[in-house]
Structures are given as structure tokens and as C-alpha cells.
Amino acid sequence: MGEEDTKVIVEPTANGTSSLQKTSDAISGKEVQENASGKEVQESKKEEDTGLEKMEIDDEGKQHEGESETGDKEVEVTEEEKKDVGEDKEQPEADKMDEDTDDKNLKADDGVSGVATEEDAVMKESVESADNKDAENPEGEQEKESKEEKLEGGKANGNEEGDTEEKLVGGDKGDDVDEAEKVENVDEDDKEEALKEKNEAELAEEEETNKGEEVKEANKEDDVEADTKVAEPEVEDKKTESKDENEDKEEEKEDEKEESMDDKEDEKEESNDDDKEDEKEESNDDKEDKKEDIKKSNKRGKGKTEKTRGKTKSDEEKKDIEPKTPFFSDRPVRERKSVERLVAVVDKDSSREFHVEKGKGTPLKDIPNVAYKVSRKKSDEVFKQLHTILFGGKRVKATQLKAHILRFSGYKWQGDEEKAKLKVKEKFEKINKEKLLEFCDLFDISVAKATTKKEDIVTKLVEFLEKPHATTDVLVNEKEKGVKRKRTPKKSSPAAGSSSSKRSAKSQKKTEEATRTNKKSVAHSDDESEEEKEDDEEEEKEQEVEEEEEENENGIPDKSEDEAPQLSESEENVESEEESEEETKKKKRGSRTSSDKKESAGKSRSKKTAVPTKSSPPKKATQKRSAGKRKKSDDDSDTSPKASSKRKKTEKPAKEQAAAPLKSVSKEKPVIGKRGGKGKDKNKEPSDEELKTAIIDILKGVDFNTATFTDILKRLDAKFNISLASKKSSIKRMIQDELTKLADEAEDEEGEEEDAEHEEEEEKEKAKGSGGGEEVKA
């Protein structure tokens, strides 16, 4: 009987499987398997206890009806568990885990389930016998109901005992089979006694617990059956939720990794592609990926409870609300508004913007006289006033005034011409007459300063500025040059000798002009007859007056009219230029001419009476200058007694030479008079050989300290009674050749003398020679 009572509850269900097996179907994972095995052991113990109690009730005849009712209720519980398991079959992962657990449970429960199947028939027979006794014992029914309530309460409290059951799982697995064997071997009598004692204690405890449970059940909306249904799936749901959450976290991590990889790829694509269309396509792809992820998460979370679903939804909503902030966002970025800032506009230079409009006339820079006068003028006030009249009150730098004025080519009237002309006239009328005359001079407008009125000047200026043009063909440059030529002094030969050094600089600049005038004078010399003679007489008078004035200044008495030889203007200009050329050549010779001067001085002393020399006054002036120079050079160089004795020797012959020409003045007068009377007659010109012989004779008796090229020409003219101005160039060459010959001879003689003299004396003589050269140049 004991074996039959323990096997009553392990009744097969409608599907042919035990109820113990079906409760584990809803549990997934190793933990669920362990909990299920622990529960089965406890239930088996409780069923054994209830079996003993039922044996006592069988004696009374009413116990089997309660057991049948409990069996029906267990069947209902198993059916409900099947439904829950059917819902969970949708999850492939949970099913796999359940299959693994089922295999393990089958291995552990083979002995128990096998015993249960063999004894099902015995249980049915005992139930039928018990049904007959239930009608006789109504009190037993009440006891059965109370026991059933206890069992249900025990099942409800199964969750509370779950923690303790988990601890006992490891040790209970192996003990299940042993306990089943012990139950079979225990005597029925011993079991009945032990069960009675236990049942009495348990009944008292169960009554107390049932009272508290009944109060709880009253407050609940559903029955105890609903509570049992909810309690078990809640535990299962919590476990599944924890697993699902872990799985979701892992999946989210993987998704985040994938998203990070995708973001990196997207960043590379964005760096390469800046177009908005690509950005939009990428954003659409990202949205589709998010939707797919949401769908997958929804599929995964179908087995989850409403709480987990609410959590996931809230998390997803937060993710949607909180925008991502990667380095390069996938979404299209709005265009930034450009910031408008106030910037101070810098005005460009007015000089760069200044523009001169073209007029009807020619630009002032193309009119030569106007351009020349504007360039020579230096007063800025005149140009400022002109600039305001021509271009208005525009500010311009002082350096650019002339440039703008020279670019002016006439007024370009805008609007009414008459009004514009009136404005210009008003501007001119405000200016003084003197300034207006300056404007006329600038623009080369001829105006009579005394007679013309201010109004007439203004009208002329306005007419000219309307259409500028050249008023005259004569150039101002050439006029000024001609005036400068006329201003050069017309002096006689002695005056030219004294002032040749002053005119040397000016004469060098005008060598080209002089050669031109020389050619013209030579060409026209044959054609000129009486007119030239009359001009010569007038010029001679003027020259005589100038000579007298110069002589009075130098302290020399006046001379008669016959003393001064006279030449034309062209000849004098040519002579002065040739003198300057001779002086430059004599400077190059230097020491050569010094020796010649000494020899020629000795020769001239012996031949004073034979050859007539130059007039006395210029000689005295030059001698005084040379004496002064010699004194200065001697004082600077040496103060020895030898030098002083030599100076005295050299000064004595100079004084004698100065006295000799004074005596010969009376002798020269008839010669010059004859030349003046005969010069008008045309005689044959001498040949070159005759000229050479005459030049040699003249050079032998000439004092090189005072003589000049004009003096030699005058002597040649006096000798041949002809003006030799046409042959100046040939005469000049002859004189130069003779001078070089004399210089060479003098050098040879000096070389012989230098051997005899000491080196100190040679240096002094060279110093004297250099002083003599300077005198000749002067």
C-alpha cells in the first residue's frame, strides 16, 4: 500500500507524459534544470507524506475522492503549463536550451518515471475502491479539502523555498534514487506511525498558514489557481529577461562596433565626397539600418515581458531623441549665415584716380615752347591756380601739378557751353593782371603788357584753353641761345690775352657752334665787299672804346686809335675758341715748353729792334701776374740764397723786355697804319712755304710768356697786308709743328746742362718751368 500511495500523484497526463517532465519544459538554462530537479524531490517527499495520510483516510473510506479531485486539478495545471510552453516554442534559442535540459532530466529521472508508469494501474483500482467509501464519510471530505488547500499553499510557497532548493540541488540529485528504494523497503507499519506523528504536527502548522493565505487570497483579484499560474512564469520570465538582457547587451556592443566601423567608413566617404546628395543617401541608408535594427530587436524581445519591452522602448526613444555627435555628422548640415561686419572703406589715392579728359586741341606737352617754359618755371602758386582753373578744385600733390597741366588738351564742356565759359572767365577775372600775364607767358601768347586790358587778356586765355595750339614757329630755346652768344664780350687781342683763362670754360662748350659760324664766315668772306668794310669800321671803334676802359682799369695810359688791330665778330669768336684749344694742348706739354721759353727769351733780347713785338700794356699786366706767381711758388718751395739769386737774374731780363716794347710803340704805329690802309686792297694770298718761313721768324722773336695765337696772326696779316682768317686752321698746324721742333731742341740742350748742374737745381728749374707754363696758359 505504501508503494501505491507514493505513486498516485505521478499520474500520466493527456499527452502521455508525466507532469514532472512538463514543468521543466518551460525552464531554459542550467539553473532552471537544477531548480526543477530540486522541486521534484520536494514534491515527491510531500506526495509520500500525503500517501500515508490517504492510507489512514482509506480506513475511513473517503480519502480517494479528494485524491481524484487533486488529480484533476493537477491535470489542469499541467495543461496550463503546456500552453505556456507552446508560447515559448517561438523562441528557437529557448527551445534549444530546453531540449538540452530535457535530456539531462531524463537521465536523472529514469528510475522515478519508470516506477510511476508501472504502478498507474494499481492507483486506478485504489481510487475506485475509495470512491465507494466517500459517500459514507462526509467528514473525510472536509479534511481532504483542507489538505488540498495546504498542498496548494505549499505550491504557492514554492517560489519562496526556491532559494533553499537551489542549495540542495547538488546533493539531492544522487539521493533521489536512494530514497525511492528506501521507501519500498520500509515496513508499512513503521511508515504509518511516523506519518501520523508528522501529519498531526503539520496539520496544526498548515491551519495557521492557511488562515494567512486565505486573507491574502481575498485581497487578490484572481483565485489561487491564477496565482500559481502567474508565480511560475514570473520566475521563468525573470530568468529569461536576465539572459535576454545579457544577450541584448552583447548584441548592442556588436552593433556599436559595427556602427563605429560604419561611421569610420562614412567619414572617409564624406571626406572624399562633399556633395549634399551623397550625404542624403548616406543618411537614408543609416535610417534604414536603424529601422532594421529596431525590427530585429522587436523580434528578439517578443518573449520578453511588458517591463523589458518598456525599458527597451524608452532606451530607443532616448537614442532617437539624443542626436549623435560624431566628428562628421551623417545628417545634412544647414548652411551657416555669413556674418556681415562693418569695414571702414579706405579711399584710394586721388592721384591714381585722377583722369585728364581729351580735348579738341593739342596737349600742352606737344607744344615745344609751352613745355619748355613750364619745365623752367618753379613757382608752385602759379601752377596751383592754373590747376584749379583747368581741372577744378581736386587735391593733387605738388609734384604732379606740372604733369597734369602738360596733359591738358582743351576744355571738354559738359552741358551748356556758355555757362561753363562764364565760370572759367569769372575764375580768371578774380586773378591779378600780373598773374594773367604770367599765364600768357607760359602759354606763349603774345600780349602788349601796357596797352592791353584785363578783359582782353582773359578772352585770349579762354580762347587758347578751348583749343590749345602753337602760336609761333620760333623756338624759345634757340632765341635764348642766340642772346647768350651776343652777350659774349668783343675784346681786342691784348684784352683777349689777359682774360683768356676766364673764357676758356665757356669757349669749350661752344666749340661746335663756333666751327659752324667759322664755316659760314669763310664762305661769305669773298662775297662781302663794301658792307663788311663799313661794319668793320664800326666794330673797330667799339673795340677801341672797350680797350681804353680795360686799360684804365689796369692803370695803363690810353692809346691812339691806330694801335689796336681790328677784326670782325666772327674772327674774334673763332680766335677765342682756338686760343682755348691751344691752351689745353700747352697744358699737356708741361715741362717741354718751359725750356723753349728760356731760349726764346734769350733770342728775343738780341732781336728786339729787328722784329716788332706786341703792344706794351697787355705785356705789363701778364708780366706782373707771372712775377707774382713766381714769387709765391718760390716762397713755397725753397728760401735758399741760391734760389733768390736766380730769381733776381730772371726778373731783370723780364723788366728789360717790358721796357723795350714801350720804346717800340712809336715804331709800330706807321706799320699798323700802313696795314690799316692796305688791308682794304685785295692782294694775293701767300703760299704755305712763305707762311712757314714767316711763322719761324715770328716765333724766334716772340716771348712765349705773353704771346698768343692771335698775336701771331696779326703779325702775319701785317707782314702780308692780307687778312688770313680763312687759313687759320693751316696756320695753326704750322705753328704747332714749329713749337714741337723747338721743344725737342730745347730738351736736348737741357739734357746737356742738367748733367753739369746738381739735382737740387734741376728740381728748382722744373718748378720755375711749371710756373712759366701756367703764365703762358693765362
UniProtKB/Swiss-Prot annotation:
Keywords: Chromatin regulator, Coiled coil, DNA-binding, Nucleus, Transcription, Transcription regulation. GO terms for molecular function: DNA binding. Residues 1-334, 475-689, 741-778 are annotated as: Disordered. PROSITE patterns: DEK_C. Residues 14-26 have a biased composition (Polar residues). It holds the Pfam family DEK_C. Gene3D superfamilies: Homeodomain-like. Residues 244-286, 527-553, 560-582, 745-763 have a biased composition (Acidic residues). Residues 685-740 form the DEK-C domain. GO terms for cellular component: mitochondrion; nucleolus; plastid. Residues 621-631 have a biased composition (Basic residues). GO terms for biological process: chromatin organization. InterPro entries: DEK, DEK_C. Residues 191-300, 526-587, 732-766 form a coiled coil. It is found in: Nucleus; Nucleus, Nucleolus. This is DEK domain-containing chromatin-associated protein 4.
